[in-house]
Amino acid sequence: MPQERSKPLKSETSAADGPPDYRLVGRHGMFPRTSHDEIERFNFLAHMNRHLASQVLPGVQAAFEARVEPAQLRREGPFRTRHAVRKALLAEPAFQVWSALRRATMEQRQQAGRWVTLRQGEALNARADELTDGDDRLQLDPGMRTPRYLTAVDHHCMPGSYHGEVIPGDVTGAANYDCGLFATTGGALGRFNDGGGRAVAAWVKEQLPDFKPRRILDLGCGLGHNLLPLALAFPTAEVIGVDAGAPMLRYGLARAKAMGVDNVRFVQADAEDLSRFADESVDWVQ
């Protein structure tokens, strides 16, 4: 029987100020398995990102108010556009420090996530295929042309962005996104990274208590972090997620099924063209 640890004296403790331990992250049947060292990498990044957001970024605002904005007012008058603000901040040391560190943690976060997912890629892909094979709630379009604004850059520094595939039927990019977002946000979105969707659902229920949507359309749904809370909050509605990235959609349906959420559909499409949906056929678009 393990020995009970003695409780520290109150004078020796202080309230925790930081993200929760990665071991508390919400896990489901599609979630990648993590080793001790992989967990601690995510813990370091979560704490670093929380520190940058809570301690370093406010210093950028202070520098803007104390140096950048007064210099602009003396030189040309008020800033006219956000682009002008950004250009001025690029020369500010406080912004340079924050920006360099934030970029570094994002690159490290992608390295950490890919170490986790690529080593078990075959197992993840097989698990997703087993859960989604023959399910008409996954509607992929191999002939869809991915818009250039998605192919021109690796969004969030993720190699291949959200649409890239290492092998046919790949879900490793989506799994990387799912297991690493907790570290990116410092746990701010909750155990399942679904805080945004839960907040929207709660607000709608409070503000529109009689609203009973039959169909909800989520554009740019990714793997469904914000889609599933809507499906759970409105169980009689069909919640349809649209995204350009096939890996995200494969993983999204597999994740939904692993979590026991059935009233969902994942559709690969360019959100610029929604002609497949008839006019007035949905009650809620987001």
Language model features with spans:
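Generic N-terminal amphipathic/basic segments
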Residues: M1-E92
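N-terminal auxiliary segments of SAM/dcSAM-dependent transferases
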Residues: F79-G169
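Conserved alpha-helix/loop element of class I SAM-dependent methyltransferases that forms part
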Residues: N176, G190-K212
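Solvent-exposed beta-strand/loop surfaces, strongest in extracytoplasmic domains of secreted
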Residues: L181, T185-R191
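Structured loop/turn residues at beta-strand edges in well-structured enzyme cores
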Residues: F211, D262, E280
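Conserved class I S-adenosyl-L-methionine
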Residues: K212-G222
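Class I SAM-dependent methyltransferase SAM/SAH-binding core
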Residues: L217, L227-D273
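A short acidic, Gly/Pro-enriched loop at the edge of an enzyme's catalytic core
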Residues: E272-V285
